[in-house]
């Protein structure tokens, strides 16, 4: 339906021109990353613009989103560990005994890194430690501090049942082992090109995070975690106007997203959520959360779709209106010709399903809050700015990535 070029990119241009800090989610091969870099130059954007890629190591900045100096609250840090494991579990995962036991290990190990080894408190260090240490070493590590013992109580209390302990640990390592072994992801998440505090009043930032279809199951939970980290920093004291721009937003799941637009709007935060059809929201978040998400967006655009489930709901958004129907009857008999004209009024859908299947690219109907047009049916101009290829951030060799990974291994081997 042309949503990105006709609605998305013009909105992105407006946010950047207005000097908002932001988080941009890019799904299509650096498309929005190129756009953002171009717009930053075009509009003399006053803040830093950083790009994150987990596939192209020369066109990515590196950052540690869970760095203790960034996540300064222990309770928040532990909640982020919960968010990460939940994201790797998927939407159909159960928070059962095994999940809770695995989460206890993750939180117990993580809090020790946070407090005792802040220089190694990165996602790559934590997951590699958990996946390589084994039951005996992890038990000893968790017993090293009272706080970690409490958090991992279920695992430690099962000390007399090696089978139970192994089940808890394997539940965790099965979720994290692929991440621990992905050297490029470890490279990106163990660097410090910038602090992942996007609403720092002294240094606001625009960050463009790119997914990749080939490994999206691996990196989507990481991106979800990064968004959660940034969103949990907001308070009423925030003075930095901020926006989340999520193109193809249903290609990953965000913890508690149904609450975010309504809550964060009080903190100077705006959302753009683009998806191919509303039915995809329901697939990711469920029926009731979909309703909550949709109700929290004041401006809604509906374009062409042939999604059967979406076509059931789209006409309901705009309701019905009374329309006059005129029927004419003609008859003849020996006495001559008879004609009658009947006018009736009946309620019909303002836009029916056929209407939504026949919209052109860039053509949308919708409703807007606080606007001079409450409802609209328009065809928008396409964004046509010429964009340059993404610049190289750092020249990177394969040996650099390997050396970084081996350094992580050396770091965790020295931890007691």
Predicted regions located by residue number:
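Conserved ATP-driven motor cores of ASCE-family P-loop NTPases powering translocation/secretion/packaging/pilus
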Residues: 261-263, 267-368
């Amino acid at each position: 339906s042309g949503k990105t070029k006709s609605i998305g990119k013009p909105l992105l241009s407006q946010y950047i021109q207005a000097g908002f800090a932001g988080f941009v989610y890019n799904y299509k091969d650096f498309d929005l990353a190129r756009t953002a870099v171009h717009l930053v130059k075009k509009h003399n954007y006053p803040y830093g613009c950083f790009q994150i890629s987990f596939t192209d190591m020369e066109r990515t900045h590196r950052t540690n989103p869970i760095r203790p100096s960034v996540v300064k609250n222990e309770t928040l840090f532990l909640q982020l560990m919960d968010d990460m494991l939940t994201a790797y579990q998927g939407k159909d995962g159960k928070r059962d005994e095994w999940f809770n036991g695995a989460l206890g290990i993750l939180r117990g190990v993580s809090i020790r890194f946070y407090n005792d080894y802040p220089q190694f408190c990165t996602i790559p260090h934590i997951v590699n430690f958990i996946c390589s240490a084994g039951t005996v070493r992890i038990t000893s590590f968790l017993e090293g501090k009272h706080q970690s013992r409490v958090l991992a109580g279920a695992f430690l209390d099962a000390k007399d049942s090696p089978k139970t302990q192994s089940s808890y640990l394997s539940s965790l390592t099965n979720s994290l082992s692929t991440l621990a072994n992905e050297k490029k992801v470890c490279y990106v998440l163990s660097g410090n090109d910038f602090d992942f505090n996007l609403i720092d009043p002294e240094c606001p930032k625009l960050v463009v995070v790119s997914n990749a279809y080939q490994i999206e199951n691996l990196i989507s939970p990481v991106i979800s975690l990064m968004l959660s980290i940034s969103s949990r920093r907001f308070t009423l004291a925030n003075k930095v106007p901020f926006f989340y721009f999520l193109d193809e937003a249903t290609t990953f799941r965000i913890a508690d997203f149904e609450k975010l637009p309504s809550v964060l709007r009080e903190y100077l935060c705006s959302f753009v959520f683009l998806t191919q059809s509303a039915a995809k929201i329901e697939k990711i978040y469920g029926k009731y959360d979909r309703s909550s998400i949709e109700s929290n967006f004041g401006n809604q655009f509906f374009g062409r779709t042939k999604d059967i489930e979406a076509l059931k709901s789209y006409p309901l958004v705009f309701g019905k209106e009374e329309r006059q129907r005129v029927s004419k009857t003609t008859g003849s008999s020996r006495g001559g010709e008879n004609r009658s004209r009947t006018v009736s009024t009946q309620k019909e859908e303002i836009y029916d399903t056929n209407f939504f299947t026949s919209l052109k690219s860039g053509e949308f109907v919708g409703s807007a809050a606080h606007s001079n047009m409450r409802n609209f049916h328009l065809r928008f101009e396409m964004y046509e700015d010429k964009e340059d290829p993404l610049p190289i951030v750092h020249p990177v060799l394969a040996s650099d990535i390997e050396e970084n990974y081996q350094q992580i291994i050396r770091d965790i081997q020295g931890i007691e």
